[in-house]
């Protein structure tokens, strides 16, 4: 019986696919630990999953807790899908940056704001990975990213694998999200778009966009329309610079680049879901628990649950492939570069389509404009250095990362270092490795 720990069991975007694959499709004997900061969500997730397991004849044991540290002992795998957005810490970052006139550095992923967010998230991630290396050293860690939360996926993967020695892979839904965005923009049906995205997490680009019915390349049309559309100023800028269409549910690549006239003044936090969505999820889990998925009421609740997440992000399928049970293809896998993405040194984490099977993980080669190669090499090195700084408390690595961070281009480094030092001091209880 495999033991699987789900950290962020109530994660809106990922829980449906995890539940479906574990208890409806796979149905193998499994011990599942549901971990969530919301104890009610953790319990409802466990009970809802138990109802699925019973209905579909899956032998399973369930536990729930709010403390991840209690769940990892002897685990066969850990799936991390918590959003990890510290809103209180983020607000403090924004206040300080606005006070000193660096409001455009209030970002979640790049620059000063991104550095602070990285250090907060990776302080926790280092604790988790260190514990895994001691208590379940052979267990893979699968980190999921919705694009809305506070986890910088590439840096988290670098931290867990490179710094802590835990085998780590990351999953995102950027291709699925980009398909929805561009189908709406081009006034087409999603199923008619053949799309591929690759690059780095939060810095992915459209590498293929075709009309399935007509078998025609849609990239020239999409670029032309965006360059003529005042609402797509950011996309147009990147098309001019790099000859590529930015991927994602919304254009966020600016967070990892220097400021321009068209880049937003600061990042606006978008969760993708609201309180009402989570309350509906809880209600549906309760209905599923009481009625089971085979009754009309339970079937309706399960139907609403299973269609409300990201359908392409399936960590259980990845685990089965790693365990040699069933090969799988992943649209957007964050993995150590094996040559699939040009410009990035081997071993640094990239985001690309990949195949996972008995013989390992293999990225599928993609073609990105040469204008992006050096930049992605620079950003991937930034990810490594920020991960090293956050996991070890190295201020030397932090300074080195800031020196090459494209988001800090044109900003006085000495002044910025002083500002960041003040921000760290104000939240030193969350950055124990630096103090």
Language-model features: locations:
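Rossmann-like NAD(P)-binding element
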Residues: 35-40, 55-136
């Amino acid at each position: 019986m495999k033991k699987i720990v789900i950290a962020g069991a109530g994660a809106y975007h990922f829980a449906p696919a995890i539940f479906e694959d574990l208890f409806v499709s796979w149905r193998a004997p499994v011990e599942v630990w549901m971990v969530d900061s919301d104890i009610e969500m953790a319990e409802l997730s466990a009970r809802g999953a138990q109802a699925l397991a019973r209905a579909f004849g899956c032998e399973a044991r369930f536990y729930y807790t709010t403390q991840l540290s209690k769940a990892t002992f002897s685990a066969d795998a850990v799936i991390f899908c918590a959003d990890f957005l510290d809103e209180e810490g983020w607000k403090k970052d924004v206040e300080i940056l606005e006070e000193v006139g660096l409001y455009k550095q209030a970002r979640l992923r790049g620059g000063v704001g991104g550095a602070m967010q990285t250090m907060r998230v990776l302080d926790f991630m280092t604790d988790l990975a260190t514990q895994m290396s001691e208590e379940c050293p052979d267990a893979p860690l699968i980190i999921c990213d919705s694009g809305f939360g506070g986890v910088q996926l590439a840096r988290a993967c670098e931290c867990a694998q490179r710094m802590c020695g835990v085998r780590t892979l990351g999953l995102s839904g950027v291709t699925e999200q980009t398909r929805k965005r561009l189908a709406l923009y081009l006034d087409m049906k999603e199923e008619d778009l053949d799309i591929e995205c690759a690059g780095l997490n939060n810095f992915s680009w459209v590498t293929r966009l075709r009309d399935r019915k007509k078998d025609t390349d849609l990239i020239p049309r999409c670029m032309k329309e965006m360059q003529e559309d005042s609402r797509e100023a950011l996309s147009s800028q990147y098309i001019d610079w790099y000859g590529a269409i930015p991927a994602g549910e919304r254009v966020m690549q600016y967070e990892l680049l220097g400021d321009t006239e068209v880049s937003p003044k600061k990042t606006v936090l978008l969760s993708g879901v609201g309180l009402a969505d989570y309350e509906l999820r809880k209600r549906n889990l309760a209905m599923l628990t009481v009625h089971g998925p085979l009754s009309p009421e339970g079937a309706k609740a399960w139907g609403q649950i299973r269609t409300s997440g990201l359908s392409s992000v399936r960590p259980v399928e990845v685990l089965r492939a790693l365990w040699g049970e069933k090969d799988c293809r992943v649209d957007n896998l964050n993995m150590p570069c094996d040559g699939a993405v040009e410009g990035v040194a081997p071993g640094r984490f990239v985001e690309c389509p990949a195949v996972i099977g008995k013989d390992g993980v293999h990225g599928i080669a993609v073609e990105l404009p040469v204008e992006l190669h050096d930049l992605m090499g620079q950003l991937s090195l930034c990810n490594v250095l920020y991960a090293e700084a956050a996991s070890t408390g190295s201020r030397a690595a932090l300074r080195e990362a800031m020196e090459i961070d494209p988001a800090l281009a044109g900003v006085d480094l000495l002044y910025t270092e002083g500002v960041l030092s003040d921000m760290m001091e104000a939240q030193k209880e969350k950055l124990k490795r630096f103090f």
